[in-house]
Amino acid sequence: MEVLKGSYKQKSFQSLKDLGQQGSSAAPGVRPTKSLQTSPIGSWTSLSHLRLEKLAEGSGWEELQDYGLEELRDGFFDASYSRPQRVAATEPPVSTSPKAQSPLAVRCKAFRDRLRVHWKAVVKFTVAYLAAMFLCLVRPASDWIGDVYSCFLPVAVLIHHPVRTVGVQLEITVQSIVGLALGQGWSALWWYVCSVARVGRHEGALLFLSLVLSGLWSSWLAAAYGRLVYMSVSFGITATFFATSMPPSEGSLPIWRHFWDQGMSYLFGLLLSLLVCIFLFPRFGHATIGRGFSSAANDLKHLLDYLVDARYCNDIPMLVEAQENAVSAIDVRLSEGYREFANQFSITRFDGKLLEQLRNSLTIAASPLRSLPLGHGLLTNVELERFHQARPQSAPENTICVRDADDHYEDQAIKTEESANLGLACGSTDLCSAIIRDKFSETIFDLIMELIHALNSLQVGLNNISESNVSASERADIKANILACLSNLHDRIRRLDIKYKEFGRAGLFTSELLLNPKSSDALVFLRYIRQCAKHMTKVLEVFLQLNASVHWRVIPPKYQWHRAIHRLSHQCALDQGASFLWNYFQTKRDVDDAFEMIYNSYTSKHHEVSDLFSRQGMRPRIRAFDHKDFAVHSTSNPIRYKLWQLNNSLLGPESRWARKFTVVLVALCLPGWLPGSKVWYREYHCLWAPIIYVILSNRRNSSNWRALYKRLAGCVLGVFWAWCANQAKHYSNPFIIATFSVLLCIPLAFNYFAYNRRKSTLAALICFTVPALVTFFLEEHTTASLWKQAWTTGVALLIGTFCSIPINWFIWTFTARSELSLAVSGLLMHLSQSYQIVAGRYLYRDTDDHPNDLTRSLASIREVRLSQSLLATRALVRSAVSEPNIVSEFRAYLFDELLDHFSVLLERLIEARRLGQHFQVWDRDPNTETTRALLSLRRDNVASVIFIFYMLSNCFSSGSKVPKYLPNPIFVRKKLFDTFMKLAEDASARGTSAHSSTPAAPNNTDPSSPSSAGQDHWDEVYAICFSRAFTDISVELQRIIDLAKEILGQEGD
């Protein structure tokens, strides 16, 4: 009976103890292998096996006895455990002495650099603010706009400042106008109710109800849908103003002119910011996205430069840093920049679809570089210096008509006697590396240099077409340059392919060479550079189309609405404060959605599970990878799931924040409704306390005492400056107030943009603007009246500002530290899903079910999203460090080390995914008996890793201690290799190994043909590197277990 791959119903090796006594009778079950010389049994696992044995011996673990019990049921697995040991405490990093104060010259240079970058933003911000102040200080204009309430005009300018792209500014202006209209409509309704049929005798209760409803709705809307925050703030400001500005005496008619005063002032502020944004240093997003692509190409070029630079080629830390920077440039900065571009109205010269294709093709081209072995030893200092000296003397070849690199070229080289001798003498490690270096170093150097030249040309071309005045002749020059790069790149790829074939036909692939880690790294390095170059040709082709389609066009937002509604533009997120947290939550939502989509996607070519089992009478069996194992949804009823989503949104954290926010808002407005205080509350404009509270509050800003001190200090400075502006000679002189505005606005604007102190600067400017203008409109200007008005209003602003931060410290508190545990839990879950996909879809995939284009595309999305999630979580750690230590000391170094291991784990998963698609693990087994014997052990290895991931994920999400007994991933994998080597030795002793009893290959495959032999060689290389990557995953996972126990604690301790 034929053994079905992936079926756990077959007997395991432990149940086949008589296998070693069967002699040669097992020969019919032997699977054909293709090369005796290059595929020794166990060679692809021997290096990893040796490493695991050393780790097991050196760690002092004591394996627990399993008494020979074996799990044979579907859906269960056997795990290997070690006796728990006390986790050694990780020493915190040595704290360095505080840095000495930078010299004055250095600080002046840093100041000049910041000024050179942000001077346009400072000018735009200052012009808009001063224009708003001038309109308020010119009495005829201010009387018509809104009289004393014209101070809403500069406040609206400050909230919606013009230093944004035109598309974003237009969007937030429309949002705020809608919020203003809704707020005035809502308030007009309640004012009408308060003035009809004597209902308004106790209008405070009605206004209280109005404010409660509006506060709940506006705060929930901003918390649930981040993109609508400006509509929510405008609605909240308007509703709060009208809830506290009713006439102070019962029976008085409402002053309906207040609707004109507040509405026109706020509207004029919105339109003024929009006009300044459009006409003064306008930004349409065109140059920004062009610079983003250019910067990403430059970072890739730097990595390749270091690889062929004699000074840095052996500097592994420098190369790792350049590699990480290149990965971050593509996966994070370029990706975020394109999302920013696609999420807004843009006036650009780029075609949106071609720009997306360029982003995707550049991401694919950079993907092999993140798994590039850096210690390959293929390029040495001496050779690089020699190649660089010889390169200027040889003119580059511009071959225009070159066939595609994937075409098969006839190799004219023949096996020389020298090559044969080299192949026989390839036993030395150094000699193996020298042979590969001799054959490939010059060719790969030329290919890397051509890649650098292509990236440089791409960077220059992007910079040129990003300019608004690029001419047709310049575009023609760009096209000619890119075509030359494309031709040269094809030629270099062809030469490398010829070298491949020469190397394979020379008989240099030997078992000794393959068992040399340096050799396998060098061969993988060649393949990854070749893949990068091949994908780079696609990048250049897309850029040629982009260059040919350059003309001005308007591109509307094309981001998916269900994701765009939660995404706030970068500048707006900075303005809201705690931009790290905004970025973290946006990234977390995108990553969760992407993983749910990917994890539940069926990419197999077998449309039904039963397609794998076409025989009659056989029930469908559980596959090696089942998407229902860890599905997010616990119900298949769509209506029930939608109801759960609705209930979660109404009663979730957003709703809790809305209730807490509204309680504080009502408390700040309460004096405006009480008979004993509502007169002075309106007279001294204390209604600005709840208004500034609405403006400054942020649900996801934990902050600390230092942030509170800075915000309050800014408020005191603003109030003091406002009193000084009115108290100066010629009381409340508009020219003096305008002068004071200029003197305050310029440094604060620089502080706003250059140092990203957004909320404290905004609070300072509002606390200057409101007291200055309110005092300016007083009928009587005396020293006492100016002091009383300015400081009474200022104290109200201080109270509202003070409440905007501690609200997050009490009742349903938000802290970055509590969120960090959930972030780590999510990362563990996503890493587990990625591991399961790699194991099920790549390593143990079904027969004739190779990963297709869809599978690879989803893998690329998954890897990019995980990289973004890791960086966002690192930013969350930095936010957690700034929080005060109240209950216990926060050990950030443990989370930093944990995330470092996550990063290594992710890179190994990416490496395993790239390698696993090139070989079939079942073909590495010598016979079907071995495959059947190893099925349960392979199941145990994968299932143990997944089980550990999910146990740790649940511990972090619930805050529970880590169980004392968890499977030891090193022991489980070592057990698999032990069994594999024992089977190989038994088969060799019986004389039934593939070396002596391999049946003839199928008729359609000639194992002696050069192409078949070359493929066998590369299969062996990929298998060795894959085994090493999967072993690294087990090693890293054991260290993650120890760190989790140190962070959360261990049960029983």
Curated annotation (Swiss-Prot):
<comment type="similarity">
    <text>Belongs to the BRE4 family.</text>
</comment>
<dbReference type="InterPro" id="IPR049453">
    <property type="entry name" value="Memb_transporter_dom"/>
</dbReference>
<feature type="transmembrane region" description="Helical">
    <location>
        <begin position="735"/>
        <end position="755"/>
    </location>
</feature>
<feature type="transmembrane region" description="Helical">
    <location>
        <begin position="794"/>
        <end position="814"/>
    </location>
</feature>
<comment type="function">
    <text>May be involved in intracellular vesicle transport.</text>
</comment>
<keyword id="KW-0812">Transmembrane</keyword>
<feature type="glycosylation site" description="N-linked (GlcNAc...) asparagine">
    <location>
        <position position="547"/>
    </location>
</feature>
<keyword id="KW-0653">Protein transport</keyword>
<feature type="compositionally biased region" description="Polar residues">
    <location>
        <begin position="9"/>
        <end position="25"/>
    </location>
</feature>
<keyword id="KW-0325">Glycoprotein</keyword>
<feature type="transmembrane region" description="Helical">
    <location>
        <begin position="228"/>
        <end position="248"/>
    </location>
</feature>
<dbReference type="Pfam" id="PF13515">
    <property type="entry name" value="FUSC_2"/>
</dbReference>
<dbReference type="GO" id="GO:0006897">
    <property type="term" value="P:endocytosis"/>
</dbReference>
<feature type="transmembrane region" description="Helical">
    <location>
        <begin position="205"/>
        <end position="225"/>
    </location>
</feature>
<feature type="glycosylation site" description="N-linked (GlcNAc...) asparagine">
    <location>
        <position position="701"/>
    </location>
</feature>
<feature type="region of interest" description="Disordered">
    <location>
        <begin position="991"/>
        <end position="1014"/>
    </location>
</feature>
<feature type="transmembrane region" description="Helical">
    <location>
        <begin position="177"/>
        <end position="197"/>
    </location>
</feature>
<keyword id="KW-0813">Transport</keyword>
<feature type="glycosylation site" description="N-linked (GlcNAc...) asparagine">
    <location>
        <position position="647"/>
    </location>
</feature>
<feature type="glycosylation site" description="N-linked (GlcNAc...) asparagine">
    <location>
        <position position="469"/>
    </location>
</feature>
<feature type="glycosylation site" description="N-linked (GlcNAc...) asparagine">
    <location>
        <position position="1003"/>
    </location>
</feature>
<feature type="glycosylation site" description="N-linked (GlcNAc...) asparagine">
    <location>
        <position position="464"/>
    </location>
</feature>
<keyword id="KW-0472">Membrane</keyword>
<dbReference type="InterPro" id="IPR023244">
    <property type="entry name" value="Brefeldin_A-sensitivity_4"/>
</dbReference>
<dbReference type="GO" id="GO:0015031">
    <property type="term" value="P:protein transport"/>
</dbReference>
<feature type="transmembrane region" description="Helical">
    <location>
        <begin position="143"/>
        <end position="163"/>
    </location>
</feature>
<dbReference type="InterPro" id="IPR052430">
    <property type="entry name" value="IVT-Associated"/>
</dbReference>
<keyword id="KW-1133">Transmembrane helix</keyword>
<feature type="transmembrane region" description="Helical">
    <location>
        <begin position="760"/>
        <end position="780"/>
    </location>
</feature>
<dbReference type="GO" id="GO:0016020">
    <property type="term" value="C:membrane"/>
</dbReference>
<feature type="region of interest" description="Disordered">
    <location>
        <begin position="1"/>
        <end position="38"/>
    </location>
</feature>
<feature type="transmembrane region" description="Helical">
    <location>
        <begin position="661"/>
        <end position="681"/>
    </location>
</feature>
<feature type="transmembrane region" description="Helical">
    <location>
        <begin position="262"/>
        <end position="282"/>
    </location>
</feature>
<feature type="transmembrane region" description="Helical">
    <location>
        <begin position="117"/>
        <end position="137"/>
    </location>
</feature>
<protein>
    <recommendedName>
        <fullName>Protein BRE4</fullName>
    </recommendedName>
</protein>
